[in-house]
């Protein structure tokens, strides 16, 4: 847009100028994270009550439908909302440039929240693949892949035009999240549709179980761990008023997590 081009022209003429960062997408995801956090935790409270007092399982509002609404709202609505907000905030400042595309940022914001709304509605209606943390049916899975690719283009486009040569540790962790979640989602969600809201997994038996918990384990690792570590590496030194103790240790931390964590999914199948 015009303001973005004006900012870039000013930076070319004066390399020391402070870029105008896009804060609207940060605010948007922060607000949506709060909303989904409240929704998810309220539904989670109902699920906990239903476990303790089964008489609170009312009709279609039973535990089997309430629980996946809770997990999807908290993981993909609340936590990922925080991750999106934090990464959009941090990447711009660590690269010292505005995000690659304001339009892609808006599509990411509104597209992702539309996906969470669609997830809540379809799960409430009983439309589910019955795969934990991957319950959503194939039309929503495709939408997730599209919006995630848009986020990836925005991130890598920003990195390509960055004005800071060194990529700080936080960016490494966010990039790992972008790449790994795309791979996990596409492989685990491969399915054969038989109707608009019904599909069967492309895998069978023990292979399906192994792939599902390779995904489930790494959803924890690359949605709830690596991006949060990225936020920690960015905000902790700022709050402490001191630089990170060792950039080399942070890179060792990163590669240790990448090489060890991703292969441990089958332990979820040991009972």
Where are these regions (language model features)?
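Intrinsically disordered, low-complexity sequence elements enriched in Ser/Thr/Gly/Pro
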Residues: 1-3, 104, 163
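Segments that form or flank anion-binding pockets
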Residues: 132-136
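Functional cores that coordinate and move charged inorganic groups
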Residues: 208-211, 241
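Cytoplasmic juxtamembrane interface segments
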Residues: 11-22, 149-167
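Extramembrane terminal tails and long inter-domain/linker segments of multi-pass membrane proteins
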Residues: 1-28, 55-60, 200-208
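Hydrophobic cores of alpha-helical transmembrane segments in multi-pass integral membrane proteins
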Residues: 27-55, 60-127, 138-159, 171-196, ...
């Amino acid at each position: 847009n015009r303001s973005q081009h004006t900012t870039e022209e000013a930076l070319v003429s004066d390399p020391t100028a402070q870029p105008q960062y896009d804060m609207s997408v940060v605010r948007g995801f922060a607000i949506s994270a709060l909303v989904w956090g409240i929704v998810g935790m309220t539904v989670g409270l109902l699920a906990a009550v239903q476990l303790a007092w089964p008489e609170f399982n009312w009709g279609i509002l039973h535990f089997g439908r309430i629980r996946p609404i809770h997990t999807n709202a908290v993981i993909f609505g609340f936590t990922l909302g925080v991750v999106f907000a934090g990464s959009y905030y941090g990447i711009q400042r660590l690269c010292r440039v505005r995000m690659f595309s304001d339009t892609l940022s808006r599509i990411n914001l509104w597209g992702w929240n539309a996906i969470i709304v669609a997830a809540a509605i379809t799960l409430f209606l009983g439309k589910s693949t019955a795969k934990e943390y991957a319950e959503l049916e194939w039309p929503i899975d495709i939408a997730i892949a599209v919006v995630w690719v848009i986020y990836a283009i925005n991130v890598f486009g920003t990195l390509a035009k960055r004005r800071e040569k060194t990529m700080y540790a936080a960016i490494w962790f966010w990039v790992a999240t972008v790449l790994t979640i795309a791979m996990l989602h596409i492989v685990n969600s491969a399915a054969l549709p038989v109707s608009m809201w019904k599909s069967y997994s492309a895998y069978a038996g023990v292979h399906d179980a192994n792939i599902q918990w390779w995904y489930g384990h790494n959803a924890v690792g690359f949605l709830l761990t690596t991006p949060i570590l990225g936020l920690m590496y960015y905000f902790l030194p700022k709050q402490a008023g001191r630089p990170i103790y060792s950039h080399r240790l942070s890179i060792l931390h990163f590669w240790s997590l990448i090489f060890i964590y991703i292969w441990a999914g089958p332990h979820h199948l040991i009972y």
